[in-house]
């Protein structure tokens, strides 16, 4: 039998305050968490939604070093940007604090000391990379090198961003310091470790036997770790940014960010509720839920629970809904490559359209596998679903009521069989949406809510009240009453998903408030109830708007290619005699035309100083024929003739290929006689 809880504590992964929030963060963590919290609030359940910025860790110190500022400067800037963006986007945290707060430093230090005094840590001396030039130990993100799996350059000591593989610094091929660029050496250092192997027995029972209902990706990743055997994990590291390890002999060492950050959920709760925070973290009648991305599964399902269990007074998570990753236009989202749709920029570019992004990210949520966000899909879902289905039905029902009944809810007369069938269809929506939300299937739940609008559109299309207005106003009133009840139900059903639109619709309907318990009823709007003026809930997004966003990404891709450009390696040496076999000359282009049925080919007539020759070249995508006529080009004159599209080509025009794939024909700087040799 499922346990009943008195209250629910919901946490969402703390975003790193070293950059803005992007759509991958939203789709993976914050939108689903917010949907669930809003759903519980509508049900009048006791729920607390905890958020905050993770402000320690190496990525922050690296950014500070690059920018020539302090780590505090970096986290201050991004904490406030992230917090403001979440507020504008409607992520309804009860508290959004930070891990540089005094409350957090005190609580995290006390947590460490409790475990230390209970003998829950082991001390180990190990060898770690050390930068002799900078005279500092190197944390994992301060070491880069070649990934041993995909062999891409620039992999970090904890993860390869290219293939996503988790790494240790010693896994890297040809490691180097991100501080000085020098090759690091191994040097001894002492740290404290949480012996996860000591907790393996109860973790195996708790996860593999007691929580088989967890999502397959969560359960599977945990099982994989447990089957491999858990190892002690360092809880301290050599850094000067973070919470100092609160024991003697720990100078120059701070709490490892994975140990420090999840305690932030607790300290943020304490900051909000200094007198009652323990109820939300220590009472067995409180349900604890962590919303995270798949890269955080192990920390929230194995490491943090082991910390809580070792402390002894905390509850453990009841569920850890974790999503897979969201990609962008077929490529992995990357902060370092600026390959992302940033939330603060979206809010500027699409004012008043928070719900469009919330809808699209939920409709395409990576709940069971990695999914892809494309701007074309964003536009299609807005125009074909939000505008054409939901918005269209609401507008028709409201405008027809305004036209025929002065925006007052008409009476419902005798019901036809079709009316009864329609009412029965939407009476079941509450149970269906609830069933899906209770098991964190947000994508399907939103689809079920949208189905209400489809029912409404079909009902209006089938009954055609505008045709009955001249002969049977009683029937028109019944049709519009049923339609308006559907509209009111839509406002409630979509409130967790599209809060801004539901609020707008609530005002149009002149309703004071929503309650989840009312969903599915057909008497939400009493007869004679005065409606307000109808407005469009959503508006079409034009092609030009989407093209601008796509162009922004193309510009980013081009900038990345420019920044990462490396010329191809030089080919093996050849003998001078081999080179002299090539007869490279300058010719003047007399004629140029496109080759029929060949997108890439141009046909040239070239004066080579001796005669006129024909050459076919694959540069049609890079030049128009008319811009080349009269120009001089370099070509190989003694290449054996070959037939291309039925045309005999008597040579090869030389071009240079740029890093973006574009071609530039090689031309002499000064005009020379046709047939001049290139030496």
Swiss-Prot record:
Homodimer. Keywords: Aminoacyl-tRNA synthetase, ATP-binding, Cytoplasm, Ligase, Metal-binding, Nucleotide-binding, Protein biosynthesis, RNA-binding, tRNA-binding, Zinc. A motif ('HIGH' region) lies at residues 15-25. It comes from Bacteroides thetaiotaomicron (strain ATCC 29148 / DSM 2079 / JCM 5827 / CCUG 10774 / NCTC 10582 / VPI-5482 / E50). This is Methionine--tRNA ligase. Belongs to the class-I aminoacyl-tRNA synthetase family. MetG type 1 subfamily. It catalyses: tRNA(Met) + L-methionine + ATP = L-methionyl-tRNA(Met) + AMP + diphosphate. Is required not only for elongation of protein synthesis but also for the initiation of all mRNA translation through initiator tRNA(fMet) aminoacylation. GO terms for biological process: methionyl-tRNA aminoacylation. Residues 578-679 form the tRNA-binding domain. It is an enzyme of class 6 (ligase). Its cofactor is Zn(2+). GO terms for molecular function: ATP binding; metal ion binding; methionine-tRNA ligase activity; tRNA binding. InterPro entries: aa-tRNA-synth_I_CS, Anticodon_Met, Met-tRNA-synth_bsu_C, Met-tRNA_ligase_1, Met-tRNA_synth, Methionyl/Leucyl_tRNA_Synth, MetRS_core, MetRS_Zn. ATP binds at residue 335. Binds 1 zinc ion per subunit. It is found in: Cytoplasm. Its EC number is 6.1.1.10. A motif ('KMSKS' region) lies at residues 332-336. Gene3D superfamilies: HUPs, Isoleucyl-tRNA Synthetase, Domain 1, Methionyl-tRNA synthetase, Zn-domain, Nucleic acid-binding proteins. Zn(2+) binds at residues 147, 150, 160, 163. The gene is metG. It comes from the Bacteria.
């Amino acid at each position: 039998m499922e346990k009943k809880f008195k209250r629910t504590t919901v946490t969402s992964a703390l975003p790193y305050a070293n950059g803005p929030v992007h759509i991958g963060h939203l789709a993976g963590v914050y939108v689903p968490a917010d949907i669930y919290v809003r759903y519980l609030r509508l049900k009048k359940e006791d729920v607390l939604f905890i958020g905050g910025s993770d402000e320690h860790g190496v990525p922050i110190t690296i950014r500070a070093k690059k920018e020539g500022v302090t780590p505090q400067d970096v986290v201050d800037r991004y904490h406030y940007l992230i917090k403001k963006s979440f507020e504008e986007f409607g992520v309804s945290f009860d508290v959004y604090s930070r891990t540089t707060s005094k409350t957090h430093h005190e609580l995290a230090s006390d947590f460490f000391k409790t475990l230390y005094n209970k003998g829950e840590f082991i001390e180990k001396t190990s060898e770690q990379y050390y930068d002799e030039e900078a005279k500092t130990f190197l944390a994992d993100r301060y070491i880069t090198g070649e990934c041993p799996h995909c062999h891409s350059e620039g992999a970090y000591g904890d993860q390869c961003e290219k293939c996503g593989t988790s790494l240790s610094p010693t896994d890297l091929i040809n490691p180097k310091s991100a501080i000085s660029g020098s090759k690091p050496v191994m040097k001894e250092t002492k740290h404290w470790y949480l012996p996860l192997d000591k907790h393996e027995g109860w973790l195996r029972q708790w996860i593999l036997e007691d929580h088989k209902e967890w999502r397959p990706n969560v359960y599977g990743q945990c099982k994989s770790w447990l089957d491999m055997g858990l190892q002690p994990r360092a809880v301290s590291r050599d850094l000067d940014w973070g919470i100092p390890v609160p024991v003697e002999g720990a100078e120059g060492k701070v709490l490892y960010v994975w140990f420090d950050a999840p305690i932030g959920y607790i300290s943020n709760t304490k900051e909000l509720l200094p007198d009652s925070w323990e109820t939300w973290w220590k009472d067995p009648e409180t349900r604890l839920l962590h919303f995270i991305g798949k890269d955080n599964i192990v920390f929230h399902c194995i490491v943090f629970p082991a910390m809580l269990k070792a402390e002894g007074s905390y509850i453990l998570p009841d569920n850890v809904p974790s999503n897979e990753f969201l990609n962008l236009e077929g490529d992995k989202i990357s902060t370092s490559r600026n390959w992302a749709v940033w939330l603060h920029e979206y809010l500027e570019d699409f004012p008043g359209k928070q719900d469009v992004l919330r809808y699209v990210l939920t409709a395409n949520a990576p709940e069971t596998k990695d999914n892809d966000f494309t701007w074309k899909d964003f536009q299609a879902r807005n125009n074909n679903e939000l505008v054409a289905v939901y918005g269209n039905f609401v507008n028709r029902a409201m405008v027809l009521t305004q036209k025929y009944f002065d925006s007052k809810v008409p009476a419902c007369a005798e019901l036809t069989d079709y009316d009864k069938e329609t009412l029965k269809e939407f009476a079941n929506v509450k149970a269906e949406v609830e069933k899906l939300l209770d098991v964190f299937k947000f994508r399907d739940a939103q689809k079920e809510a949208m189905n209400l609008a489809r029912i409404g559109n079909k009902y209006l299309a089938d009954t055609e009240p505008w045709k009955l207005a001249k002969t049977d106003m009683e029937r028109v009133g019944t049709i519009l009453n049923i339609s308006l009840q559907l509209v009111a139900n839509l406002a409630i059903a979509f409130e967790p998903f599209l809060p801004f639109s539901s609020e707008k619709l609530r005002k149009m309907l002149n309703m004071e408030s929503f309650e989840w318990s009312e969903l599915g009823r057909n008497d939400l709007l009493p007869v004679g109830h005065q409606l307000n003026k109808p407005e469009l809930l959503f508006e079409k997004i034009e092609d030009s708007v989407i093209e601008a966003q796509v162009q922004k990404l193309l510009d980013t891709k081009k900038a990345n290619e420019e920044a990462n450009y490396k010329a191809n390696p030089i080919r093996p040496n050849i003998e001078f005699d081999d080179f002299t076999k090539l007869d490279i000359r300058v010719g003047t282009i007399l004629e140029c035309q496109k080759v029929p049925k060949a997108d890439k080919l141009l046909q040239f007539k070239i004066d080579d100083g001796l005669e006129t020759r024909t050459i076919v070249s694959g540069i049609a995508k890079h030049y128009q024929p008319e811009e080349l006529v009269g120009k001089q080009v370099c070509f190989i004159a003694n290449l054996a003739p070959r037939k291309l599209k039925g045309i005999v080509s008597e040579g090869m025009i030389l071009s240079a290929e740029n890093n973006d794939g574009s071609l530039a024909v090689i031309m002499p700087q000064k005009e020379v006689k046709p047939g001049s040799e290139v030496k």
